[in-house]
A protein has these predicted regions:
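Conserved active-site alpha-helix within GNAT-family acetyltransferase domains
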Residues: 146, 158, 169-186, 192
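Active-site rim helix/loop that mediates acceptor-substrate recognition in acyltransferases
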Residues: 37-60
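A short beta-loop-alpha structural element at the N-terminal edge
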Residues: 4-18, 22
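Conserved GNAT acetyl-CoA-binding A-motif
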Residues: 126-128, 155-168
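Conserved acyl-donor/pantetheine-binding loop and adjacent beta-alpha core of acyl/acetyltransferases
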Residues: 72-134, 140, 190
Length: 205
């Protein structure tokens, strides 16, 4: 089934953040950081709102008309998340992290530093960065993820630009490999001791 893909509007940011919480609330990394479901929801809705707001300002957020999935992309030249850019988008991402418990914040930031260091080391040329891809649980397995990736993958191929991402599950590794990504490095994410895969997609001619 072919799914329509549209650009998320800023007025839809809160709805998109709630959808992403629904998509990721059972992921092991967030269950490790926030064992209590109420605290997890509160932390994630603020954090994902910050991610979406940042990507709307500096990149592209693709979704479906009914907002059942979302892909947050940062383009070549903007793929590095910086504090200055976070400030320009209203500190939403910082507010989310500050709202974590001290222990969760320490563990989360250890993971962030690890992924940022690997990102800089593994891909040094201009590239698209898939910061976040989430699909509502009741739509997973029905082609939404592929549809949300396709517009930017096609543009990257046309422009001869690679793409980069990180993922924390083997199931996602299989999914991304089918879309042309290859594992560049694997490791354990500090703070949570969970696996992380760093993946790169070279442009397809």
């Amino acid at each position: 089934m072919k799914h329509e893909v549209v650009t998320l509007q800023r007025s839809q940011l809160a709805q998109a953040a709630e959808m992403l919480v629904w998509a990721f609330q059972s992921d092991q990394i967030y269950c490790e950081l926030f064992p209590q479901s109420d605290a997890r929801h509160k932390a994630l809705v603020t954090m994902f709102g910050g991610v979406v707001g940042y990507a709307l300002h500096y990149g592209e957020v693709l979704t479906t008309p009914e907002i059942r999935g979302g892909a947050c992309w940062l383009p070549p030249g903007q793929a590095k998340v910086t504090l200055w850019r976070i400030a320009r988008t209203g500190f939403g991402l910082v507010r989310g992290i500050v709202g974590f418990s001290q222990e969760a914040r320490k563990r989360f930031m250890a993971g962030v530093m690890h992924t940022e260091t690997a990102h800089k080391r593994l891909i040094t040329v201009p590239h698209w960065y898939l910061w976040l891809l989430g699909v509502a649980p009741d739509r997973q397995g029905h082609g939404y993820g592929s549809a949300l990736l396709q517009p930017i993958l096609a543009r990257a191929d046309q422009d001869g630009v690679p793409c980069y991402l990180e993922t924390q599950t083997e199931r996602n590794v299989v999914f991304y490999r089918r879309r042309g990504f290859e594992v560049a490095e694997t490791g354990l994410m500090p703070g949570v001791d969970l696996p992380v895969w760093h993946m790169v997609r070279t442009p397809h001619g």
